[in-house]
Amino acid sequence: MKHQVKRYHDISCGHRVVGHESCCSRLHGHNYRVHFTCESEYSDNVKNGLDHVGRVIDFGEVKSKLCMWLENNWDHKFIAWNNDALSKKLAQVEFNHSDIDTSDNNSFVFVPFNPTAENMAQYLVDVIGPQQLNGTGITLTSVTIEETRKCSVSYGN
């Protein structure tokens, strides 16, 4: 058995699910809760995969490497599939109203997948986890994303 470290982070962002048979094909948003589960890669080298202090990783490291990635890249943004023609058109709209702040031109984040919670969780485990945790001896083993308190998806072991 291995020890696991779990931490969650809340973000708010929009998306639309291209090809969805119901209202999720429309522009909408969620207050997501993203749960990260990490394990040590060094179970053979360190006692039970724990460091000299007796932990897998400091919770602050999970926050700075994974939670803050979410905060900086997805929070309060619109996540759009790079194949979504509607989102591409919306991202090009220029607002000329004095009451709309246009100083942030990074409101749209284009990703190489249809932004379902399932695909978002897989992307975090397969792409972002290895990038952000590189050199730490820690692996992001699973992600659970709650779209609502009633509906969630998980990817990983």
Question: Which residues fall in each region the model found?
Answer:
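Charge-rich, low-complexity N-terminal segments
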Residues: 1-157
